[in-house]
Structure formats: C-alpha cells, structure tokens
C-alpha cells in the first residue's frame, strides 16, 4: 500500500470511531481524562526520555527549544490541565435556542460535536495532550500531524493515550497521529469527507501553507504580532511591570510582546521603562527618536536601529521593537498595519482613550492596563485551548470546548405536513 492508501484507510477508521464518541457519557469521558492525568505523572520518565531524544537534535539557541522542552514540572501542569478539563461542564447538548412554530412543530437548536478535527502543529508536544483532552471532552475524534522535531515525544504521548483508551473500552482510533513524512500533512489537508476541520498551530509560514493548500475547512490560530501602546496618560510604574511581563515571562509564545508603542510625550520615561528589560538581555530595535532616548542608558550591545522588517515580526525570543507616535490615531494606524489581530494592549488612565482603543482595534483580544500574557484559554477560565483563533468566522480568541462544537436543529412534530 502507498502512504496515501495507508493514511486514508486509517482516516476512515477514525471517522467510524468518531460516531461512537457521542454514545459516551460525560462521566465516562471524565474518568478517561482523570486516569490519563494520573498516568502522565506515573509515566513521566518514559515521556521525558522520548523528549530528550528530540531535544538532542535541536540547538538550545533555537526559539523552538523552549516549546519542545518537557520536564516534570511541565508534565505536572499538563496533568492539572487534564483534570481541569474533566471538571468543566460538558459543552454538548446545550440548548441554544428553542421555539414552537404556528404549525405546532417544536424546534430545538443544540450543541453537537464537529466530528473529526485535524491539528497541524510544530514542536510543541504539550499540544498533543491538550488537543486530545479538549476534543474528547467535546465529543470529537482527533487527527494529529506534529512537527518532526517532536516526533519521539508525540509518539510516546500517543502510545500512552491509546493505552488509557483501551483500558476504558474505547477505540484508540479516536486519536490518530500521522506518520512523520511531510507528504502526510498534504494527504490530511485534502481528506475531504474524512476530516471536518483543520486547525494549524505554529508559525505564520505554516498557517499560510495550510490555508493555501487545504481542501478541508481551516480555522487559523494565528501567529501573534503583539503590540502594547503606552499612552501619554499612562501610569509608568504600571507600564514598566506590564511590558516586562509581556515580553519576558515566556518570550517564545504567541501572546508575548513584539512591539512597544510609546507616545512622544512620554519618551523621557522610556529609559526607565526599558531598564528591567536589559536585565533580561532583551534586544531592542528602536526607531530614531526612541533610539536617541535609550542610547545613554541601554546597553549598547542590546540596542539596535529598527529596520522596516522589525515591525510586523513575531520575534518569539528576547527581542522587541519600539515605535514612537505623536497621537492615538498614529498608534492605531500602526497597529492596524502590522497587527496579526491576536492580542493588543493599551496602558492609560484616560477613559476616553480606552474607549477609542477598544472600539477601533481589530483583534481577538484587546487589553487595557494588563499584560497580553493573559491570552490563554486556562487564564480565561476555559480550560486548556486548541489555540488562539485570529479569524472572525466560527471562533475568535481562545478556542476551548465551546468552539469545538457546532449545532443542529431537532424538530418534533405530531404528524404535521407542509401545505402545497
């Protein structure tokens, strides 16, 4: 059999298995997730050994290294997320709308699973756990195409999940990890009738490739080109804490700060605002005015002149750009030009500026006086997430349980027929 034949045969098995998930009670699903959470801890050494094999192939300086890395603390966090998903209410069979027509027909619109969800992602083995938990809880089967950089990790995780499913009498076909060959992703993206929806998680290049190649419907979980605008009426102590957190907490994730925009009236505060960043070795690409302001105090090895490409870049590392503006309109224009519509933040005490910013910024998540690091399903109280959708159709922002369902109309009658 060819690779395509093998994959399509397995995808049909996934499709068949997906039809049986709806027969599982929420109680049964929760038991699977709670059992898996316990096994993550007890099987930690096997998972970490597989992860070490992947890490050995990657340079520590690679921005993806931190995303690839698993350790006992991160596995404990994944297990906690698994238990959290189990504790959440089921998103299925929720009545969204209900009415009785003049004909006597009773209509009920209720949430149902999407079916088979495909995920294409890069070197993030934690995604394998997160996606499985969310898809199972929402009644969906899962097809995964992880990055080759994390292949050992993903295979170990999938093997553990399959073992737990079999122990609970559930077909392991509800989770299918595709072969590592690049061709497998193309076969997946063209599997109309087998896969209902594909979600890419990773770089803008990956997302663009999936959007341009897939025949299966796609929901984009976007690269984060994230801005924070420090207004003329900002509290600078607050701004200093927020900027530091947004940039340095986890610089390799999509909600990390990429461009600091500062009002020209507050340029005199820029050196103090950026001082904590230098302690974290953050490289700053500054425009002319901010460069001159930072030059006397910011370490010369960390201060660079900004080039056009430094705006609209998702750095995923300890790098950021600085843009000086004279007005709110100029800040909004810059954001509109370069934003990936992921997360954007404003720091100000001016409520009129806040209202204008909230109204005019086109992004999935818009902040006032808070770090963009909060763009996360768990932080929103949604449990783990599939990703952050930057598009407007079906889902926007953190994609958690509700976003992994669709709906159907159920109509009850008493023999009604429609008149000619």
Swiss-Prot record:
Pfam families per record: Aldedh
Associated pathway: Amino-acid biosynthesis; L-proline biosynthesis; L-glutamate 5-semialdehyde from L-glutamate: step 2/2
Disulfide bonds: none
Transmembrane segments: none
Gene3D superfamilies: Aldehyde Dehydrogenase, Chain A, domain 1, Aldehyde Dehydrogenase, Chain A, domain 2
Family stated for the protein in its record: Belongs to the gamma-glutamyl phosphate reductase family.
Known role: Catalyzes the NADPH-dependent reduction of L-glutamate 5-phosphate into L-glutamate 5-semialdehyde and phosphate. The product spontaneously undergoes cyclization to form 1-pyrroline-5-carboxylate.
Name of the featured protein: Gamma-glutamyl phosphate reductase
Organism: Chlorobium luteolum (strain DSM 273 / BCRC 81028 / 2530) (Pelodictyon luteolum)
The gene coding this protein: proA
């Amino acid at each position: 059999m060819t690779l395509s034949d093998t994959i399509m045969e397995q995808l049909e098995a996934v499709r068949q298995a997906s039809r049986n998930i709806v027969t599982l009670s929420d109680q049964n699903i929760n038991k699977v997730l709670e059992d898996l959470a316990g096994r993550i801890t007890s099987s930690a050494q096997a998972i970490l050994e597989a992860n070490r094999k992947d890490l050995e192939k990657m340079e520590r300086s690679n921005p993806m290294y931190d995303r690839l890395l698993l350790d006992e603390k991160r596995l404990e966090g994944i297990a906690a997320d698994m238990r959290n998903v189990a504790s959440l209410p089921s998103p299925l069979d929720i009545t969204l709308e209900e009415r009785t027509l003049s004909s006597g027909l009773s209509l009920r619109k209720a949430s149902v699973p999407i079916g088979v969800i495909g995920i294409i992602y890069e070197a993030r083995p934690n995604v394998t756990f997160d996606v499985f938990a969310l898809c199972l809880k929402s009644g969906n089967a899962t097809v995964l195409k992880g990055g080759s950089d994390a292949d050992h990790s993903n295979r170990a995780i999938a093997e553990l999940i399959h073992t737990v499913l079999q122990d609970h009498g559930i077909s392991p076909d509800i989770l299918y990890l595709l072969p590592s060959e690049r061709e497998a992703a193309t076969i997946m993206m063209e599997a109309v009738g087998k896969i209902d929806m594909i979600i890419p998680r990773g770089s803008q290049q990956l997302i663009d490739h999936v959007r341009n190649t897939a025949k299966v419907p796609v929901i984009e979980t976007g690269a984060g080109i994230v801005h924070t605008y420090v207004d003329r009426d900002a509290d600078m102590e607050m701004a200093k804490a927020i900027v530091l957190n947004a940039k340095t907490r986890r610089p390799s994730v999509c909600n990390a700060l990429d461009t600091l925009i500062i009002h020209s009236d507050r340029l005199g505060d820029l050196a103090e605002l950026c001082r904590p960043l230098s302690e974290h070795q953050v490289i700053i690409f500054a425009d002319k005015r901010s460069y001159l302001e930072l030059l006397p105090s910011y370490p010369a090895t960390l201060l660079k002149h900004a080039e056009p490409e430094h705006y609209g870049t998702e750095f995923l590392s300890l790098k950021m750009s600085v843009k000086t503006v004279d007005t709110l309109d100029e800040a909004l224009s810059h954001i509109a030009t370069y934003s990936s519509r992921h997360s954007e933040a404003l720091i100000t005490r001016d409520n009129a500026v806040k209202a204008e910013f909230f109204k005019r910024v086109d992004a999935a998540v818009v902040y006032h006086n808070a770090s963009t690091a909060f763009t996360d399903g768990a932080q929103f109280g949604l449990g783990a997430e599939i990703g952050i959708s930057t598009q407007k159709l079906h889902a926007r922002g953190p994609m958690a349980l509700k976003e992994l369902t669709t709906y159907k109309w159920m109509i009850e009658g008493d023999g009604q027929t429609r008149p000619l």
